[in-house]
């Protein structure tokens, strides 16, 4: 077996001194791509030659001004408007929590409250009540094969009217619109009138007539408030 090479104390001190000198050299100044070493920049030779070559190849780079870090500013402004800032646990007993499905700013119309348990109706027209009953029944039977108990709102209902058959509507009239939401044991139906020429939107919006033939008030919206 080949004998392991041995070094004298002077040789070890010289190697350590050369290595620490190289480290101090690169740590004392900034390094860019030009001063970094590659295989082509290191000539063959002993440690002293390699260290001298590295010192010769490296180019001093002027240190640029240190850019201050931007401080992140945290704004306390709420990015949205809260309708009710009172926590639910601090509300009085039996106080209904505002329903997010109902719009905060509504046009003039009627609000009907229907208690599903007792069947009590506070206010509203016949159409809105029947529409709420039909919507509740459709929701409860949508995943079953049972026939609905009531035929309210169907074609067999004497109060049923199919749209588009009346020529008077084409000349300009009002269109009754509804917004239905379930809040606990209550069904809330909000209804209002829009001109027949107004677009149909998903939100409760009040439009004005653009065709010039729709009346300002019809028989259905006379009692709206």
UniProtKB/Swiss-Prot annotation:
What Gene3D superfamilies does its record include? 4.10.80.340
Example GO molecular function? metal ion binding
Segments crossing the lipid bilayer:
none
- The residues that the entry says bind Zn(2+) 1 are 174, 193, 218, 221
Q: Which residues bind Zn(2+) 2?
A: 197, 209, 211, 214
Entry keyword Glycosyltransferase:
no
Compartments annotated for it: namely:
Host nucleus
Query: What Gene Ontology terms for biological process does this UniProt record contain?
Result: symbiont-mediated suppression of host cytoplasmic pattern recognition receptor signaling pathway via inhibition of MDA-5 activity; symbiont-mediated suppression of host JAK-STAT cascade via inhibition of STAT2 activity; symbiont-mediated suppression of host type I interferon-mediated signaling pathway
Q: Does the keyword Zinc apply?
A: yes
Q: Which GO terms describe its cellular component?
A: host cell nucleus
Which keywords does UniProt give here? Host nucleus, Host-virus interaction, Inhibition of host innate immune response by virus, Inhibition of host interferon signaling pathway by virus, Inhibition of host MDA5 by virus, Inhibition of host RLR pathway by virus, Inhibition of host STAT2 by virus, Interferon antiviral system evasion, Metal-binding, Viral immunoevasion, Zinc
| InterPro entries xrefs | Paramyx_V_Zn-bd, Soyouz_module
**Where is composition skewed (Polar residues) in this entry?**
145-157
UniProt lists the family membership as follows: Belongs to the paramyxoviruses V protein family.
Question: Quaternary structure per UniProt?
Answer: Interacts with host IFIH1/MDA5 and DHX58/LGP2. Forms with host DDB1, CUL4A, STAT1 and STAT2 the HPIV2 virus V-dependent complex (VDC); this complex targets host STAT2 to proteasomal degradation.
Task: Please describe what this protein does.
Answer: Plays an essential role in the inhibition of host immune response. Prevents the establishment of cellular antiviral state by blocking interferon-alpha/beta (IFN-alpha/beta) production and signaling pathway. Interacts with host IFIH1/MDA5 and DHX58/LGP2 to inhibit the transduction pathway involved in the activation of IFN-beta promoter, thus protecting the virus against cell antiviral state. Efficiently blocks type I IFN signaling following infection by targeting host STAT2 for proteasomal degradation. Also plays a role in viral growth by promoting host RhoA-induced F-actin formation.
State the protein's name. Answer: Non-structural protein V
Native organism: Human parainfluenza 2 virus (strain Toshiba) (HPIV-2)
Q: What taxonomic ancestry is recorded?
A: Viruses, Riboviria, Orthornavirae, Negarnaviricota, Haploviricotina
Query: Could you tell me the gene encoding this protein?
Result: P/V
